[in-house]
């Protein structure tokens, strides 16, 4: 066990990786938020000023969960004949209703699409020392961070199980910071960037 030592005395910050709002949440999804809410309540009870953030992934999560495939938002939008923005709004509202039904205190809900400019800025900041570009996008080189994976006790030689092999990647565990829109395609959710038109990868979304 370790003694909890906040960065700022009297304050505690809890970040929960939020849902990809392309479909309804199931009980396994919600379990994580019950745990985080319980932690937050204990911290509040102990007198800490709590900030709890659950991000909303409304772009950039691919169907394989392994850094490859179609964007889940775009795929669901096409199947329902709606825009990706409409899909995101509908399922975010349903997720928030689920939180209320479970008596989970309402956290802050920043949406990924509201912070794309900040994501691009952060990508530019780390690109020179930590990233490399392929035809498919900008990738983070995990070998540039000697202690990468320490917090999760990950073994980088084996890689992370849900990260896909991509031609040209330097390391199996390297992941996409920015995914370029394939030539000849147009997506509903895409932005201009120094690495071409496309969308952020979900690792970049969570870190920003």
Describe every region a protein language model picked out.
Residues 1-208:
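NTP-dependent nucleotidyl-transfer catalytic core
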């Amino acid at each position: 066990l370790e003694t909890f030592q906040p960065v700022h005395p009297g304050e505690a910050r809890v970040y929960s990786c939020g849902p990809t709002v392309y479909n309804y949440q199931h009980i396994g999804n919600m379990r994580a938020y019950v745990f985080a809410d319980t932690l937050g309540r204990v911290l509040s009870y102990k007198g800490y000023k709590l900030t709890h953030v659950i991000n909303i992934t409304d772009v950039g999560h691919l169907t394989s969960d392994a850094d490859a495939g179609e964007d889940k938002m775009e795929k669901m939008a096409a199947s329902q004949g709606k825009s990706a923005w409409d899909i995101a709004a509908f399922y975010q509202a349903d997720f928030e209703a689920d939180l209320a039904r479970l008596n989970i205190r309402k956290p802050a809900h920043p949406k990924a699409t509201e912070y794309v400019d900040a994501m691009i800025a952060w990508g530019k900041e780390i690109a020179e020392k930590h990233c490399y570009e392929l035809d498919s996008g900008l990738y983070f080189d995990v070998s540039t961070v000697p202690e990468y994976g320490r917090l999760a006790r990950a073994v980088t030689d084996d890689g992370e199980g849900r990260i896909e092999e991509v031609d040209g990647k330097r390391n199996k565990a390297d992941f996409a910071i920015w995914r370029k829109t394939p030539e000849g395609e147009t997506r509903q959710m895409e932005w201009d960037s120094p690495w071409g038109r496309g969308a952020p990868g979900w690792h970049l979304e969570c870190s920003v």
